[in-house]
Amino acid sequence: MNNDENYPESRKDGTVEEIFGVTVEDQYRWLEDFTSPESTAWEQNQNKFTEKYLKKGPFTRKIGKDLEKVWDGESISTPYVQNDRIFYYFNEGDWQHSKLMMKNCLEECEAEVLIDPNSFSEDGTFSLGGTSISPDGKWIAYSISDGGSDWRVWKIMDIESRELLEETINWSKFSGAVWEKNNSGFYYQKYSEPTDELLADINEQPKLMFHKLGTSQDEDELIYENPEQPRWSWSISISENNAHKILSISDGTEEKNRIYIKSNDSENFIPVIDELIGEYGYITSKDDVLFFYSTENAPNGKVTALTIKNGSYVWNDVISESNFAIRSVNIVNEKIVINYLADTISKIKFFDMNGNHLNDFNFELAGTIGGFGGGIDDKETYFNFSNYVTPTKIYKINMEDFSYDVFWEERLADHNVDDYETKLWFYESKDGTKIPLHISSLSNINIDENTPVLLYGYGGFDISILPGFSKRFLSWMNQGGVVAVASLRGGSEYGAKWHEDGMLFNKQNVFDDFAYAAKFLHATGIGSPETTAIEGRSNGGLLVGATMLQNPELFKVALPGVGVM
């Protein structure tokens, strides 16, 4: 941007605080009141200035045309099967929201629209949240979000007739709908109705409720609460034989939880894991054996089983921790499917229910594999694959012999995978830690210090940043740019320790990892500070904001999206 451009004024006030003995100036504190007339006017002036600049840019029209081209294409989600029906989300490419589709068969038949979120509101601000189908396949509970809010309104629809029941469920947040095995209703998490503005109230003291079909929410049954622990929140699962209810209790955002269990022969939930000693994620059950993913004494993850018999609870590890972090665990056709991460690349292994290794899934490409959802008795399931240059492909796999065929693949106009290349590099951060860095571009360009570079990062909340196809990144590469994605500490790429090394008092490690990614790129002859942009969203927005202040000399442009700052 030219130096003679007149930026809109940003007023500075005199706010000064002492935090942990450090004097901190916060000259823009007034912007935290984002509903004030002054903040609103500031936002409008900033947007007007930005739009004026972008319209003058010589590349805006070219980039816009390329974005239109790459965005013009269908997309679907990985299907899941229930009650001999196939469900998936579908978008023709120009819909604001994907539609939930349903096939009334397991082979070849026409798909029909089950729920169209584009019909929820004229301006498209209402979106479809979670969905849950009753065990008998008659009902679907689905939630609606207004303007991206975490608050959800649940509705219930008859799948055959498409008729909605009269009742709605309000003030639900961070919750699914878990059906009773007899199809009588479902469990959900409810908060008290806010008394203040929705964005100002603190959400505490949730209740686990049961909603019975055909009744109003006022009649819902309270299943569990703990007023002495206002930060706790709940999710519930039910064993396959309907004998045990598994209550997972979280405390804030920590990736550890408690497990309480209520069996049919007990009146109350009994604490089985009552300390925050690790993450315990319920997978499924066989008879009275419950299977969990756990990080207790296993930072990379393991599979463990809880046998419930005559009021006793006995734990046994089924698959021990390995050198690779576990990304996901599924049990399909009585086979345990583990998705390991080997330097951010998916490695799939199959085991029997006793933990004996059956087979390695030797997929022909390197990248990210997801899916393998389904029930313990399902004979088939679906998985997906992509990387930074390969559009998404979805496969149907036979879980008897592990053979698979393409179910659907993303097709883009004039896109040839062979025209691009992606490589995994490693660099050393400030403290010597080795960090993965995926670098992608057109294969025929000459990369030097003049090459535009987009450096992306996240680094937090136990979320892995893995190879995946992005139309935004593709458009950047089509303009001759390099996309560099760093898998920073704070995520789960290398297990729980990798996460802990980038959180709380270790957060500076994440900022250092990101800065040293830029230094590595420039030292390798990939771009320069004058040609580098950094980008991140949410926690990644915080990352970019911190990097703007700590290392402004390493880049020209910063894009902090919806940062948690």
Where are these regions (language model features)?
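Hydrophobic alpha-helical scaffolding
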Residues: L198, R231-I236, K245-S250, Y293, ...
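Generic beta-strand/beta-sheet core signal
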Residues: M157, Q189, H211, S248, ...
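Cap/lid segment of the alpha/beta-hydrolase catalytic domain
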Residues: N118-S134, I144-S149, E163-E167, I397-S538, ...
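Beta-propeller folds
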Residues: M1-E380, S386-T392, K396-I397, D401, ...
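Conserved acidic residues
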Residues: K138, P452, K556
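A conserved short beta-strand
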Residues: E553-G563
